[in-house]
Each structure stands twice: as C-alpha cells, then as structure tokens.
Amino acid sequence: MTLLPDPAEARAARLACRQGAPRPTAGMAPGFTQCNMISLPKDWAWDFLLYAQRNPKPCPVLDVTDPGSHRTALAPKADLRTDIPLYRIWRDGVLAEETPDATAAWAEHPDLVTFLIGCSFTFETPLQQAGIEVRHIAQGCNVPMFLTDRDCRPAGRLHGKMVVSMRPIPAGRVAEAAMISGRTPAVHGAPVHIGAPEALGIADLSRPDFGDPVQIRPGEVPVFWACGVTPQAALMASKPPFAITHAPGYMFITDVPDTHWQV
C-alpha cells in the first residue's frame, strides 16, 4: 500500500511561497504536483486552449479556471494571485515586471482565465526515489531551461517555439529515467530528446535561456523534457496585450499527489 503525502505539507509550502523570499520550488513539498501558470484575458483564452490542445507535450492542461476566478480545484483553498513565489507580468509580449504578489495586476483584467499546466518537477520525486540524482535540486538552484528551434503548432493568434528543461542523467540510467517520467504523461511524460543539444538548436548548455546552469559530469547525458515555460515563448512571439505567468522554476504547488497522474 502506497502512503499518500500529507496535504498539510502542500499547504505549508504555499504559505511559505506567499510569505517568504521567492525561491525556486524544485524539491518543495515532495510528492505533490506542481504546475506552471498562465492567465490571459478571456478574449485570448480560446486561442490558448487550442494552442495547448495542439501542443500537449509542452502544454498539458491540468485545470482551467472560470473567467475572473483565482481559485482552482487542484488546491481549493489556495489563491492563484499570491501563492506562487514569483510572478511575471507581460504587456504586449514584453516582460514588464516580476513580483511576488500578482493581486494588483490581476485586478487590471477582471475576466482573466487561468490555465494550470503540468510541470516536470512532479516526476522528480520518483526519479529521486529510484536513486537518480536530480542535479538542480542537489545543487540548490533552478532547473536549466532552453528555447529550442522546434516550432509548436500555431492556434489562432498564438505561435512560438518549444521550451525544454534539461537534466543530466548517467548514460546507463537514461532508459530508466525515460520510463519513470513516461508514466506521467500529464506532466510532460517521457523526454523529447536525448543528447546532442545542437539538434534542438541549443548552442551552449552552460547558458540556459531560463533558470540556472548545472554541472554535467563525465559519463552523463543531457536529457531534455518538454517544458511548461513554452507558453511564455508564445507570449513573446505572439504579443497578446496582457498576461500573468509564474516565473520559470517558481511553480504553483497543488494538493494533488504526484501519483494521481501515473498511468
């Protein structure tokens, strides 16, 4: 019998995110699902829903709120305006500011529709339980993320490139890591690419577009997973008038155990 994690741990983590200094959430509340977030005016919501449906690997939708709501069934007592450690405010596709509290920005558009997107942090606990080190957690930093040259399928007014996260994995355990992550397709699932970063248009693994660089040791292979920062690449390319997102690596922690998504 598998013991479920204590929901109080998820609530405590969100409280820490709300009240504390912003920090990446990798390794926080292990055993609970973490999410990417994007909030758009209602006029853009259908375009994004279609964009996510056409690009399920980087944009797996776990919940969609009603217009104007800051609540989610994934954590009914949470507040999506305050319970992420760091938010990004976008205006005309340009990052205007980062803030630990999005309440004021949220009030600018009373019809915001929020999408919660699966995050690969969710399968990091099973990787660790299998004895596979997650390097950015071990180093106490953010996961490295890269903008690739792979186009997502466009939808309505939205288009953009796919973003990937990278984790160094010992060569002999790459297949195991792919199998473990592949059990959770709702949170990006198996890798989209293994080795050869240049095949994704990535020139330098020491210079991620988002997050922090991590050490790659001899005998390790860079493994790339589709990433929920992909919607932010679409914002930069498509330039909707307004959006709120999480800052890359600063996720929304839900009350849902990560085992819920395993198949």
UniProtKB/Swiss-Prot annotation:
Name of the protein in question: Putative hydro-lyase Pden_0321
Keyword Cell division appears in the UniProt entry: no
Alphabetic keyword roster: Lyase
Native species: Paracoccus denitrificans (strain Pd 1222)
Record InterPro entries: D-Glu_cyclase (IPR009906), Putative_hydro-lyase (IPR038021), UPF0317 (IPR016938)
Membership in a protein family: Belongs to the D-glutamate cyclase family.
Pfam family, one: D-Glu_cyclase
EC number: 4.2.1.-
HAMAP family recorded: Hydro_lyase
GO molecular function: lyase activity
